[in-house]
Structures are given as C-alpha cells and as structure tokens.
Amino acid sequence: GNNIIRKLEQDADNEIRAFVLNGDSIKSLKKLRCKIYYGDVTKKETLSLIFENTDGKEVFVIHCAAVVYIKSKYNPLVYNVNVNGTKNIVDKVIESKAKLIYISSVHAIPEQPNNELITEITNFNPDNVKGLYAKTKAEAVKYVLDAVKNKNLNACIIHPSGIIGPNDFGNSHLTQLIKEVANGKLFACVKGGYDFVDVRDVADGVVSACKNGINGECYILSNRYIAIKELCDLICDVQGRKKIKMVLPIGIAKLVAPLFEVYYSLKKQTPLFTKYSLYTLSSNANFSNEKAKEKLKFKNRNMKDTIKDTVEWMNKK
C-alpha cells in the first residue's frame, strides 16, 4: 500500500486517502502525503467515512488489504479479510460509482502442467487452486467479476507474482528471507524458485490501471523465474558475504517444514519455509506479463537493483 501512495503522491493533483486497520502501525505512511482513515474492511460501517465527499470527483479505489498466509494451520481471519472484506469494498464502490482496482494474486490462477505458459483467465474457482490464501483470492476475484457483470461495478483485477522490494514494514516472508541471508543467519537454502516482482513495478502497474485498466479485465504483473539460490547469491553479493553453498532438495525441506513453523512461531516471526511455501517453490511459475506490458505499459527493473535497494532500506531502518 505505501509503495502505491509513494507513486500517487508524485502527482500533486491527486487527493490520497489511506485506509488503515484499527490498531495497526502507520510507520509505513510516515511523511507520505495522504489522509488516514481508520477502520476494518470486514466491518462495512467503518468504510463510510473514507467514501465521503466524493461526489463529482473521479474516484479510484485501490483495494490491496489482504492477509497473505503461508502457514498450514487454518486461520478464519484469512477468509474474513480476503473474501468478506472484498465484498464490503465492492458494495461501497458500487454505491459511490467509483472504479475499483482489486489487487489479487497469481495464486488465484490455476497452475498449468509441464511448465506451460500461464496467462490471464476469466473464470475463477477456489477448487482449482491449492492453499487457503489462493482459494480466498480466487473466490474474491470471482465475486468482483460477477459484480462487474451483474451489478454494474467498474473494476479491473491485478495479479502480482511474488512481491519483493523495499518499504515492507510488515516484514513478509520474502523480506524475512533477505534479512536472514543479509545478516549471515541462513546457512542453507532450498532448491526451487518462483517469479519475483519488484513492489515498485507493481505499484506503477496498479496506478496505470486506474486510467488504463479495462472494466472486467485481469492483468498479470510478473517478472521472471528466479531460483532461491540465485536470490540468495544476489543478497550475498550486495552485502559482500560468502555465498550459501548448501542447497536442500524440496523433499528434505518438506520433512522439516513443520519444525520450521513451530520454531518461527515461538520466535513470533514469519516462517521462511512451510509446506505451502515449499509447494509454491516447486510449482509452475511461468507467468506471462505481455498483456500488462501492452495495456498498462508495465516494466520490470533488474532484480539486482531490487535486492540492493531492499538491503539498503533495511540497513537504514
């Protein structure tokens, strides 16, 4: 969210409103030009204030509030925020005659066999994807697209791949990985990889979608496949550390994943490797971003620059 605001505030004409969960830190929004509203997307009545005084204005609602979840244990909050929260946002957007840019995920799109190219789809089904997070994102997209067809909603959908980069005050599992490698605390990595995209490139694509995104259309914002070993090597290069030599096969990592989850839970940290994250690292990550490049003028920066900027941001924090 904060990276989108950083992009939006480059245009002095933009009036920016940020919706923050009650009790959440606003450290990520410090010194940013936005008016903060507090509430909870799962409680529709708390959304009223942020939608006030929008008559006669061109309004874009960028819905990026979500619970990204990679743990094995079921968590009802994931469904409540990702699905019910999205339904509430959709209802308010329809009422206010605004345009919705819904931030989904590539995880909402079914995996293709044999490393076949994965492109945008129009029919979403939670039963066709694996993991609680993916299922909730698929259900939410289905609701958004149904509202476009049946309730006169104006919306487009963004599917980012694995988001990585600076200004992650929420300390996601990828930021946790960079931190541990940069600090020399990780002595082994796992085989496999994924498509990782710079959060600032995603922010650029999202802002472009406000004006250029077509109603009812989906756009994949991806980059390229990057092995975890390559990612770790880039981090070590930036920090001037020795590269990690031990690479564990996914099968062995899956055996110890439950222990990792308990260990990080005790430390109150985001787990690096879970059963679901390991499944993801061995899944097909061959995503096409051609549509976004053509329609949204989407671009990717070099991953080395992403890692360099992220490590520098961490060191300044």
Language model segments and positions:
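N-terminal Rossmann-fold NAD(P) dinucleotide-binding loop
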Residues: 1-2
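NAD(P)H-binding glycine-rich loop region in Rossmannoid oxidoreductase-like domains
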Residues: 24-30, 34-84, 92
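Conserved Rossmann-fold NAD(P)-dependent oxidoreductase catalytic core, especially the SDR/UDP-sugar
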Residues: 84-133
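Flexible, glycine-rich beta-alpha linker
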Residues: 108-109, 132, 153-174
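A conserved pocket-lining segment of Rossmann-fold NAD(P)-dependent short-chain dehydrogenase/reductase
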Residues: 125-128, 176-197, 201
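Active-site Tyr-X1-5-Lys
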Residues: 129-156
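Substrate-positioning beta->alpha
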Residues: 139, 169-173, 190-211, 217
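Mid/C-terminal beta-alpha module of Rossmann-like enzyme folds, strongest
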Residues: 205-272, 289, 294, 304-317
